């Protein structure tokens, strides 16, 4: 397997997540969920800025007008970077105060797919929602525990999804026009010693790059054969998500976490919570934006 080199950004997130590449700003965004922080890192200048919110901030992605779309606790909002104005768009599970949003992505039609979990990680307490132009969340999957990574194939016929504790990446038939999904098969089974699958993205060859929580790296899986192709080894245990970006879409930004590490482990793995940049030999696709 290839050996990768990385550079790190000293973010020191408690729970770094949701990397997103903004083409117009030529910068990476990510969040520190529990601390409500939004990071922006300009790739050319190397400058990082941080904005803080009085909520758990679980997701950042792009809106159709250049604004950001944020998931805060159980609500979705648009955020104007120039005015710093936050506008609430929709909400889920107001009857479940222990729940919060987690990972999310937009499909090729601009619909937002976003999951929930219980902050107590209660089995079966999470769901996956689809949010379209009418801003009404529609439940697509339930009985989830940690709704997590998602990706679509280039032909928009397959949707990949991770419910982390299952240690599986599931493939669903995807109907682009309607946004309907139907379970097809388990594409990848992840063995215990490799940790838990967390966030993921897909490259132009259709391979899945998956952050392994407790697995010290990002693993590249072939979802057709279920085989592990390669691994980006990182000097931290808890790797949480990854996204392609950069001018050639060949730079992988990887988020990590300090949570669930003891003081001794944090001394042993001092870069835990930092963000890593890795140049790959493949490319990703520009992320879809939320159309509403």
Positions of predicted regions on the chain:
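A short beta-strand motif characteristic of beta-propeller blades
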Residues: 4-10, 46-52, 87-94, 136-142, ...
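Beta-rich, blade/repeat-based domains predominating
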Residues: 11-25, 54-69, 95-111, 140-158, ...
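Conserved beta-strand positions in repeat-built beta-propeller and related beta-rich domains
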Residues: 22-23, 28-33, 69-74, 112-122, ...
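Hydrophobic/aromatic beta-strand positions that recur at structurally equivalent sites within the blades
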Residues: 31, 41, 79-81, 129-131, ...
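A short loop-to-beta-strand structural motif that recurs across blades of beta-propeller domains
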Residues: 37-39, 75-77, 126-129, 168-170, ...
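Hydrophobic alpha-helical segments and helix pairs
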Residues: 85-142
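Short loop/turn segments immediately following beta-strands, especially the blade-tip
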Residues: 172-180, 223, 280-285
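Blade-level signature of beta-propeller repeat domains, shared across WD40, Kelch, NHL, RCC1
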Residues: 243-292
């Amino acid at each position: 397997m290839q050996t990768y080199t990385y550079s790190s950004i000293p973010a020191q997130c408690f729970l770094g997540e949701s990397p997103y590449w903004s083409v117009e700003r030529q910068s990476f965004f990510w969040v520190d969920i529990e601390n409500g922080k939004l990071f922006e890192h300009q790739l050319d200048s190397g400058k990082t800025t941080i904005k803080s919110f009085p909520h758990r901030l679980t997701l950042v992605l792009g809106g159709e007008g250049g604004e950001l779309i944020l998931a805060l606790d159980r609500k979705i909002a648009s955020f104007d970077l120039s005015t710093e104005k936050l506008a609430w768009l929709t909400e889920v599970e107001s009857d479940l105060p222990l729940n919060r949003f987690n990972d999310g992505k937009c499909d090729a039609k601009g619909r937002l797919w976003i999951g929930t979990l219980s902050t107590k990680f209660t089995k079966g307490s999470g769901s996956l929602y689809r949010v379209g132009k009418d801003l009404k969340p529609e439940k697509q999957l339930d009985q989830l525990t940690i709704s997590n990574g998602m990706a679509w194939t280039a032909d928009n016929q397959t949707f990949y999804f991770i419910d982390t504790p299952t240690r599986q990446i599931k493939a669903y038939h995807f109907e682009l026009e309607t946004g309907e999904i139907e379970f097809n098969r388990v594409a990848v089974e992840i063995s215990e010693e490799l940790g838990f699958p967390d966030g993921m993205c897909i490259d132009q060859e259709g391979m899945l790059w998956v952050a392994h929580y407790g697995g010290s790296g990002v693993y590249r899986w072939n979802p057709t054969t279920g085989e592990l192709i390669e691994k980006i080894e990182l000097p931290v245990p808890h790797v949480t998500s990854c996204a392609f970006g950069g001018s050639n879409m060949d730079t992988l930004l990887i988020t990590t976490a300090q949570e669930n590490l003891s003081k001794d482990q944090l001394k042993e793995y001092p870069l835990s919570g930092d963000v890593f940049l890795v140049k790959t030999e493949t490319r990703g696709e520009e992320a879809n934006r939320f159309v509403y």
